[in-house]
């Protein structure tokens, strides 16, 4: 399997491994609702939070949705979104490794990204999860109308990369029904008088 190398990769991986594990502590002042619920909001650095989840949830999470910084060049309150590619990769790699460790054998991870870091994200996910565990690239149109203020070609599409933990992972498909069959739509249009056949 090919490996993506960048400046600072080994240092970033070593630094992430050196981050100590912390136990999660409930803050009653910030708590709301049923104290026995399994739902939680974790405030803090996501690397430390992921490490804190491992003792409780390693190998048991069925679905992770990750929305990392897109590296757009914009400044956000909680993270810098204007990183060098190598810095961005060094940020993402150890977090993705921890997310992989949290996934159950039938688990999957769904990661939002745009074109700026899509190729790099795909390569490190192939390395971490395995090329054969790639499920799909879901492309979705985020903008439906062109703007006249664009300085170049407008990017209207974003991506969601989907990987499974193992190659044996099967999607939860809904059973096919007549309501989803293409012919039923044609029958609807015909009987509604919208089209004539």
Residue ranges and their predicted role:
Residues 85-139:
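Conserved Class I SAM-dependent methyltransferase catalytic core
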Residues 142-197:
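Flexible, glycine-/basic-rich loop-and-beta segments that form/coincide
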Residues 46-48, 70, 115-117, 142-144, ...:
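Short, flexible loop/turn elements at secondary-structure junctions
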Residues 41, 65, 110-112, 139, ...:
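Structured core elements
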Residues 1-65, 72-86, 91-94:
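DnaQ-like (DEDDh/DEDDy) 3′-5′ exonuclease domain used for proofreading
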Residues 53, 74-79, 121-123, 149-150, ...:
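Short, solvent-exposed loop/turn and secondary-structure capping segments
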Residues 55-58, 123-131, 154-155:
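Short, surface-exposed basic-aromatic patches at helix termini and helix-loop junctions that form
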């Amino acid at each position: 399997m090919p490996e993506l190398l960048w400046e600072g990769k080994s240092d970033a991986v070593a630094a992430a491994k050196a981050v100590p594990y912390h136990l999660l502590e409930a803050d009653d002042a910030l708590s709301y609702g049923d104290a026995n619920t399994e739902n939680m909001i974790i405030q803090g650095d996501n690397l430390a939070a992921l490490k804190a989840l491992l003792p409780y949830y390693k190998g048991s999470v069925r679905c992770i949705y990750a929305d990392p910084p897109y590296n757009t060049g914009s400044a956000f309150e909680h993270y810098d979104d204007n990183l060098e590619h190598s810095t961005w990769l060094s940020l993402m790699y150890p977090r993705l490794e921890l997310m992989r460790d949290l996934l159950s054998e039938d688990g999957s991870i769904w990661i939002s990204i745009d074109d700026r870091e899509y190729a790099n994200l795909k390569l490190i996910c192939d390395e971490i999860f395995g090329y054969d565990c790639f499920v799909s690239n879901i492309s979705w149109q985020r903008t439906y109308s062109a703007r006249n203020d664009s300085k170049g070609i407008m990017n209207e599409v974003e991506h969601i990369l989907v990987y499974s933990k193992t190659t044996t992972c099967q999607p939860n498909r809904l059973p096919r029904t007549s309501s989803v069959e293409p012919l039923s739509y044609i029958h609807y249009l015909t009987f509604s008088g919208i089209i004539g056949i």
